[in-house]
Structures are given as C-alpha cells and as structure tokens.
Amino acid sequence: MNQKKLSLFGFFALTASMVLTVYEYPTFATSKLHLVFFLLLGGLLWFLPVALCAAEMATVEGWKNGGIFSWVSQTLGERFGFAAIFFQWFQITVGFVTMIYFILGALSYVLNFQALNTDPLIKFIGLLIIFWGLTFSQLGGTQRTAKLVKAGFVVGIVIPSVILFGLAAAYFIGGNPIEIPINSHAFVPDFSQVSTLVVFVSFILAYMGVEASASHINELENPKRNYPLAMILLVILAISLDAIGGFSVAAVIPQKELSLSAGVIQTFQTLILHFNHHLGWLVKVIALMIAFGVMGEVSSWVVGPSRGMFAAAQRGLLPKFLRKTNTHEVPVPLVMIQGIIVTLWGAVLTFGGGGNNLSFLVAISLTVVIYLVGYLLFFIVYFVLIYKKQNLKRTYNVPGKIIGKTIIAGIGFLLSIFALFISFVPPASIAKNETHTYQMILLISFVVTAILPFIIYELHDKKGHDTIEEPTHFKAGDVNPAIYPAARGEHHIIKKEEHILKH
C-alpha cells in the first residue's frame, strides 16, 4: 500500500514555524532599514541554496535515512560526519542561552524587576532555574508536552506577532513619528563600514535549519515542481514577516534605548500606551504570553537536537553510557551533559558580557559560527556529490545541471564563509570599550568548539563498539510542526531494552 503523499501546503506547514522568529526582531532592528537588504540577501542567496542542495542529497539512494550525519559520512568519512552532527547539536547549547535571555527580558517587565535582565548574577540564576526546570520537565517524554508546545506557539508566538503587526500598522497609518530615517540611501548598507555588516549573521540564524525538513521531499507529491515552490513561498513569507517585525521595533524604539532581550516588550509598551495610557496591564499580559511561548519552544529543544548525537552513540562513536535512555525514550545521559554545557555557556556569556546587550550579541554570533562550520561541510559534501559521485541515483536535482548546481551551491558556500568571518568583527551597536571582550569570548569559544568533535572522535576507543542501530529518519507524520526545524532533530530514538536506565 502506497503511503499518502504530502501536498504542497502540507509540506509548507512542516517548515512554516521558522518564519516567526519574534526573539530576533530587536537584533534585526539594530540594522534599521538595512534589514530589508539583509533579509533578501540571506533568503535568496543562502536559504534557497541550502534548501535546494539539501533536497537533492536527501533523495540520493542510500542517503535517505541519516540526514547530514549520513551525507557527510558517505563522502568525507565518519570523522567529519561526527563533526557535522556535533556542530548541529552544539549550536543549540548556545541557542538556549539566547532564548532564555529573551524569556528573562519578558519576565523582568511582568515582575517589574529589571535586575532580572541587567544584573549578571541574578540573570544567571534566572537562566539556571528556567533551563533546568524545562529540562527536567522533558524527562517524562516529549509526548506529554507536545500539546503544550503547540499551545505555546499559538498563544506566545503567533497571537503576539499578529497584535504587534496590527499595532505597528495603526501607528504608521496615523502618521506618528518614526525613530529611523527612511530614504533611498537607508536601504543599502555602507560596505566600507564593516562593523555595520556584522548584524547580517543574525539574519542567517533566522534561516538556519531548513535542511532538517529537506528529507520529507521523499514524501512530497510532484517534488520537482512543489519543493522549489514551497521554498520560494517560505522565503517570501519569512522576508515579509521578519521585515515587518524588525521594522516595527526599529521605528518606535530609539537605538540607544533598545534592549536586545526585551526590545519586543519595549515595543509593545510604547505602542499600547501610545493608543491608551490605561492599558499598561495588557503589556504585562502579552509579555507573559510571549514568555510562555518561548518557554514552550525551549522545552521542545531539550530532546530534539540530542537525537543526532544519540544516533552517533548508537553507531559506536561515543561511549556506551550515552546509548542509555529512560523508559520514555529520553536519552538522559546526553540531556544531562547538554544541560551542563548550557550552564557553562550561560556563565561565560552572562558574566563575560556583563549581562547586557553584549551577552546577547555574542550568544547569537557564537550560535551562528558554530552552525556555519557544519554548513561549510554541507556544501563541500554537495560539491563532492555533483563532481565525484554523479553516478549515484537521486530523484531530485537542483536546476541547471552541473553549471547551475555549481553556481547555486557556490553562492551559498561563499556567503557562509563571508558570514563566518564577518561574525568576528565587533558590531557597531556595542561600545568601543566592549569590542575586545566581544572578540575574545567569541574567538576562544569558537576555536574550542571547532576542535572539540575531532578530539572526542580521536580519544574515544571505537573498537568493539558495533553499530546497534542505523539512524532512522523522521517521517512527516512524526514531526511537530510547531517546533522550529533546527531544534527538532532528525532521527528517532531507537530504544533497546538492555540500554534502558534502571531506577
């Protein structure tokens, strides 16, 4: 019996959650009207190449189950395959910190307790309470919280976004003052000022993770037509919504007053009180809704990305104890190690950056540079596929034959290199006395992270550690569409009786 194929809309819905990146709107706002240029650049010249190349690799015979781990292992060898899945997982450990900073920014307004967002010690304690509370809530299995994640996405992400867009539209139509200049010169950044370009990395972050959905092209009806169409629709929607969201923040909050972790709440406060001074309570309600929504998103990240590392453990690439799960199919040892790493990142970023905008910017840049190393491997693998493994059968091809494939992948590869290097330039939005701190935290953290998977691979004795299960990729029906694609993970947790933790 043939499995029912995904329609264009069904496939689009699997990835649509990535178009609402509310917590990035304040960072987008720091680029003022340049945000439109950066969104177009990232969407057309980075997101689409990643999406198209991933789709072709996902349909190669023998590559359909393993995701990026399988793709890289099949071409560059197991060592680099492990590194790719490691980077895909490790970037999330930094991403947790960024997300929780955003939650703390919202809660600081609700509780009227600004120290929660500005004092490094209090902020770090708040981060630990939220992160570990959400981590332990996931040990009972992700099925228990799946409905909560969906509710959080609707209540805390979709509804506030609609309200924000509506308020901003009313504000602009009313002819009210706007905090940023609007003219023909304001759209294109000054490329001679490198410090104004570094914010581009946050726009790349908004597009990351689409490769996790590419595997579902094997379930899509008429993929040659529908897959590119779905990706084009997705990028148009992402550019439109992110442009509106970022502009809404930039237009009403002066740049010098903008908090990257609480900027969305600042915007709601300004807009709501502009229309009615008696609705301060409504701002707190919306802030609480947003905190709830992002908490739901963070909770969905706890288990998802560790699935790839669990697949590596089941291939014998990690110590045996990392194959352990509890009865709810949660890889507890991996999740606990992940928690320790997040705690360390939280300490480094919060105390190293002083708990202010610097901490948030370093966290975003570090997330991006870690993920970009994985994407560089991704594009290298694609070049190997189209030049050295042309004989491998596949059901989808990037348009343009070998020349078109080379140009499309080449653009994505070069833009990845550009974003990687530009990340280390201190942004124009931070004070001059903070530039050295920004570079040192980012550079040291990046170097340690870049060599870590290769050290782990070399030190772990892989003799006698046979593969107990090959990775099994998610089908479309296994995916919770409310979860951001980069945080879902791509593989099932294959539970073995002998590897279940005993109480």
From Swiss-Prot:
Name of this chain's protein: Glutamate/gamma-aminobutyrate antiporter
Disulfide bonds: none
NCBIfam families: 2A0307_GadC (TIGR00910)
This protein's GO CC annotations: plasma membrane
Described function: Involved in glutaminase-dependent acid resistance. Exchanges extracellular glutamate (Glu) for intracellular gamma-aminobutyric acid (GABA) under acidic conditions.
GO BP, sorted A to Z: amino acid transport
Gene3D superfamilies in the cross-refs: Amino acid/polyamine transporter I (1.20.1740.10)
A family per Pfam: AA_permease_2
Reaction equation(s) it catalyzes: 4-aminobutanoate(in) + L-glutamate(out) = 4-aminobutanoate(out) + L-glutamate(in)
Record field: transmembrane: 35-55, 153-173, 194-214, 232-252, 366-386, 407-427, 440-460
Gene Ontology molecular function: any one: antiporter activity
Lineage: Bacteria, Bacillati, Bacillota, Bacilli, Lactobacillales
